[in-house]
A protein has these predicted regions:
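Hydrophobic alpha-helical transmembrane segments
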Residues: 73, 77, 81-112, 119, ...
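Membrane-embedded transport module
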Residues: 253, 284, 527-578, 592-762, ...
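Acidic, divalent-metal-coordinating active-site segment for phosphoryl/phosphodiester hydrolysis
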Residues: 492-494, 500, 512-523, 560-568, ...
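Cytosolic catalytic regions of ATP/NTP-dependent phosphoryl-transfer enzymes
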Residues: 190-196, 313-476, 483, 496-497, ...
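Basic, amphipathic juxtamembrane/active-site segments
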Residues: 158, 165, 175, 330-350, ...
Length: 830
């Protein structure tokens, strides 16, 4: 249906709706039939989805292929061992990841976005996912457009369609009918899912929902993925590093074994086992557990996580950009006074401001609420004829009231933006340069004391059918409304705490330079370097990159300038966070590395945010940053411990296999060893963290990871060859006893050395997490007992003499000491 070319009456008829919308019963029926108003991919992962994610691992698929090859060649024992290892690995990964996904989904469910919908003719909030075709919705500035709809009525209604059409400027939307051949950008009588309202108000009739929308049709053709975070890029680069090392080693071993005439199936199994042994195959599960745990801890501290992968970005953040209202200040605005153009108390100014505040529509402003608390106007006999809503270019709002046979216009807004439409000053004095300078002096005196100022102007015109922004001219400047918003208690301490964490605060505000400087000075923020929106416009990009770093306060800026500031800071290598709650903050939030909003924010700001704060305040963000760093540190801890130990063992095994007349470990033994050593590693997600690990922002450093792997891997290889010398040169063991001894030694050293490598401190001065400590404590005796267990022969393990076990224990203790010394040297030269 080409609904944009249909009349409203025709649409009502085809959709079975009307001006009062649907009945609640009919809406429920349609929801059952059409399903929720969601796009493909927006629903939480099912059990089957999580299980399939485990099986999509290339390494596990390689193992399954190797098991199949073994079975076809008659090696059923080897095939069974490999399949058992695959099932156990998938089981652990599935159980932990599914529980993590459920926990994260439960937290996100607390953040339902609702839209005002007419049901049974009565407006009320309805979750966006419950909207159906035929619903009549009301939208205002800051609203997300919940579905594709036709505009029924609108007042100065502008919609940002950048996400759909690429057009950066908001588009005016009006009721009417357009040509059936009109393209998407030409359908000025329609609004579309995925866009948001920048200004004005409208009533719209929903035509299509979910996958049937214009945005949904794009989603069907594309795999829509969220933007790659810094953490995602780090994981990807680490994957490239590991894959390169793995391919080189496996190819060399495979070619070497084939050259020596080893059986092809045995060579294939051994090579695949080496590849699996080198990889941290539980990394996806560790990531999910880490992120979900981080989200749960952050929720307990008042931060809801909307995008799990952004947690590490929050920990890496070194600059936080924020407005002052509600974050630096209490956000409880009080009317300080109402004054005439001479700066004297004025009841008339308050009366006009109260009428304007009470009759305007759109976003509820704390300033308007403060006016209403000071003066609740008597609207009896007042007839509103029209409105020119607030927008972020004009920074004012004008209402038109019937007054006798004429019309009174009342404008209220930012001082300079109201002054620019005035030609005289109350009572009826022409505004010359001298009077404008006097008004400017009054304004600056209040602003220098941190007092916010709105100006009020009025004009009487003849009756007319409609009103527009062109009527905002030749106004009479009536007076000032002044407001106070005191600094939040404890904010100076929170700013200091963030500075101690390596995070600097930059104020980005639409308020005046003087107000911003005054507030910043009260709470201990830098206020020496200030850049105004007008000055910012005069800077080319490269100049702004340098200037942004040294600037403490960006004042009198518009939404596009906020975004430009964020991009400039990122260009200088910073990880930038942005805290916003208004419709004008959305572009900057999308540009930031990590974005935060508050529960009371407009829809578009909450949807743009990675994190939603349940209460305002920098102290809440501090907790989130610390948890982000804990999550990152424990993930990196698993990678460093696992890959360095695995690299050392696999290099030892690869080299030994080329020179020994037998395999140093069978494929089944390699896989069992790798599986058992990974079990305690799951506990790293809940491991304790040394305080110094959260003191500074941390970012991915692939060179650091590579150096760590090589240096500690070499140490591991050295002790492996020490073990080989002991087994062959002193104990003269047979091949089965050699494999069993090295299996026990390799498993034992991986278990105990994890307790050493998990901390930069001496290991005895850093307490491990309970799960890591207990699981390691259980597996150490199991490692010694493995050769004597009933299933040991299945894996080719044989009993060992007590003297050999004592020697292995001695090597493990010596390895712990050497690792501790190597750790001190490594971090001293890092």
């Amino acid at each position: 249906m080409q609904y944009w070319a249909e009349t409203v009456e025709s649409l009502y008829r085809q959709l079975g709706s009307g001006p009062g919308g649907l009945t609640a019963e009919e809406a429920a029926r349609r929801l059952r039939e059409s399903g929720p108003n969601e796009l493909r991919g927006s629903r939480p992962l099912s059990r089957l989805d999580v299980a399939s994610r485990q099986l999509r691992s290339p390494l596990l698929l390689l193992l399954i292929f190797a098991a199949l090859a073994s079975a076809l060649s008659g090696e059923f024992v080897d095939a069974t061992i490999v399949v058992a290892i695959v099932i156990a690995t998938v089981g652990i990964g599935y159980s932990r990841e599914y529980s993590a996904q459920r926990a994260a989904a439960a937290l996100r469910a607390q953040l339902h976005v609702r839209t005002t919908v007419l049901r049974d003719g009565v407006p009320g909030p309805v979750p966006i996912e419950d909207i159906v075709s035929g619903d009549v919705v009301r939208l205002g500035a800051g609203s997300l457009v919940p579905a594709d709809a036709v505009v029924l009525a609108a007042t100065d209604f502008y919609v940002s369609e950048a996400a759909l059409t690429g057009e950066s400027f908001p588009t005016s939307k009006l009721p009417g009918v357009v040509d059936a051949a009109a393209g998407l950008a030409e359908r000025t009588n329609c609004v579309f899912l995925g866009t948001n309202v920048r200004s004005g108000t409208a009533t719209c009739l929903v035509v299509t929902t979910g996958g049937a929308t214009e945005f949904g049709s794009i989603a069907k053709r594309l795999t829509l993925r969220p933007p790659e975070t810094e953490f995602d890029r780090g994981i990807r680069r680490f994957g490239y590093l590991l894959t390169t090392a793995m391919l080189v080693m496996v190819l060399l071993v495979f070619v070497g074994h084939m050259f020596r005439g080893r059986p092809p199936v045995e060579t294939l199994l051994f090579s695949v086992a080496l590849a699996v042994g080198l990889s941290p195959e539980l990394l996806p599960a560790i990531l999910s557990i880490n992120l979900a745990r981080g989200a749960q801890v952050m929720a307990r501290h008042g931060v809801l996580v909307r995008r799990l992968n952004a947690i590490e970005n929050l920990g890496s953040m070194d600059i936080l950009c924020t407005d002052k209202t509600g974050t630096i200040t209490e956000g409880v605005v009080q009317l300080e006074g109402a004054y005439d153009a001479q700066g004297q108390p004025s009841d008339r100014t308050l009366e006009l401001g109260a009428w304007n505040a009470a009759l305007e529509t759109g976003i509820s402003s704390p300033l308007d609420d403060a006016i209403g608390q000071a003066r609740m106007p008597d609207l009896a006999g007042i007839t509103k004829l029209g409105e020119m809503p607030f927008d972020f270019m004009r920074k004012r709002i004008t209402v038109a009231l019937k007054e006798g046979d004429g019309v009174r216009l009342i404008s209220k807004g930012a001082f300079h933006h109201v002054l620019e439409i005035c030609t005289q000053m109350a009572p009826a004095v022409p505004l010359d340069d001298r009077l404008r300078a006097a008004l400017e002096t009054l304004y600056e005196a209040w602003a220098a004391r941190g007092i916010r100022v709105l100006a009020v102007a009025t004009r009487t015109i003849v009756m007319q059918d409609s009103f527009s922004r062109e009527d905002e001219r030749e106004m009479t400047f009536t007076g000032f409304l002044t407001f106070i918003d005191r600094p939040r208690e404890g904010v100076a301490r929170a700013i200091s705490d963030l500075a101690n964490l390596g995070v600097s605060i930059k104020l980005i505000t639409g308020d005046s330079r003087l107000v911003a400087q005054h507030v910043a000075s009260l709470v201990g923020l830098g206020a020496d370097h200030v850049l105004t929106g007008r000055q910012l416009d005069e800077l080319h990009d490269e100049a702004l990159w340098r200037e942004a770093e040294r600037t403490d306060i960006f004042a009198e800026v518009d939404p596009n300038q906020k975004e430009r500031i964020i991009l400039a800071l990122k260009k200088m290598g910073h990880v930038v966070g942005f805290l916003g709650d208004g419709v004008n903050d959305a572009p900057a939030m999308h540009a930031a590395d990590t974005s935060l909003s508050v529960q009371q924010a407009v829809d578009v700001a909450r949807e743009a945010a990675d994190f939603v704060l349940l209460e305002r305040g920098l102290h809440v963000i501090k907790r989130g940053i610390e948890e982000g760093r804990r999550t990152f540190a424990n993930t990196l801890k698993y990678i460093l411990i696992t890959t360095s130990a695995n690299l050392g063992n696999m290099v030892s095994m690869a080299v030994a296999s080329l020179f020994l007349p037998f395999l140093p470990l069978t494929a089944g033994q390699i896989l069992l060893n790798n599986f058992l050593s990974d079990v305690p590693a799951v506990g790293i997600a809940d491991d304790n963290l040394d305080d110094e690990m959260v003191k500074r922002p941390r970012r991915w450093d692939i060179r650091f990871i590579g150096r760590y792997m090589v240096e500690f891997g070499i140490l591991s290889t050295a002790f492996d060859f020490l073990t080989f010398g002991l087994l062959l040169g002193i104990f003269h063991v047979a091949p089965d006893a050699f494999r069993t001894s090295w299996f026990v030694e390799s498993l034992l050293t991986e278990l105990v050395v994890a307790l050493v490598m998990r901390t930069r401190r001496p290991f005895y001065r850093s307490r491990p997490g309970r799960l890591l400590l207990y699981s390691t404590g259980v597996l150490i005796p199991i490692a010694f007992a493995m050769p004597y267990l009933p299933f040991a022969p299945v894996f080719g393990l044989v009993p060992l003499p007590a003297s050999l076990l004592v020697a292995i224990a001695g090597i493990a203790m010596l390895y712990v000491l050497a690792t501790e010394l190597q750790k001190v040297w490594f971090y001293r030269h890092d």
